[in-house]
């Protein structure tokens, strides 16, 4: 997803998506540690999406303050 798609979502949707991404990241890290994970580029994608969601949430908080 790109930043514009995240900005179009509500705060509750963003928070739910952030939790979902963190669960996915945790699962990937565990699979990587066990040697079962092959698509290491997906870890980078998830990490960057987490950063995008957190940025949009802080952007919304600053705009409303």
UniProtKB/Swiss-Prot annotation:
InterPro entries: Ribosomal_protein_uL29, Ribosomal_uL29, Ribosomal_uL29_CS, Ribosomal_uL29_sf
CDD domains: Ribosomal_L29_HIP
UniProt GO BP: translation
Gene Ontology MF term list: structural constituent of ribosome
Keywords in alphabetical order: Ribonucleoprotein, Ribosomal protein
GO cellular component: cytosolic large ribosomal subunit
Similarity comment: Belongs to the universal ribosomal protein uL29 family.
Protein name: Large ribosomal subunit protein uL29
Species, as recorded: Xylella fastidiosa (strain 9a5c)
Lineage summary: Bacteria, Pseudomonadati, Pseudomonadota, Gammaproteobacteria, Lysobacterales
């Amino acid at each position: 997803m790109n930043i514009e798609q995240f900005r179009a979502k509500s705060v509750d949707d963003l928070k739910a998506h952030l939790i979902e991404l963190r669960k996915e990241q945790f699962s990937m890290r565990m699979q990587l540690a066990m040697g079962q994970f092959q698509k290491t580029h997906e870890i980078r994608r998830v990490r960057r999406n987490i950063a995008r969601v957190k940025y949009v949430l802080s952007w919304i908080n600053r705009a409303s303050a």
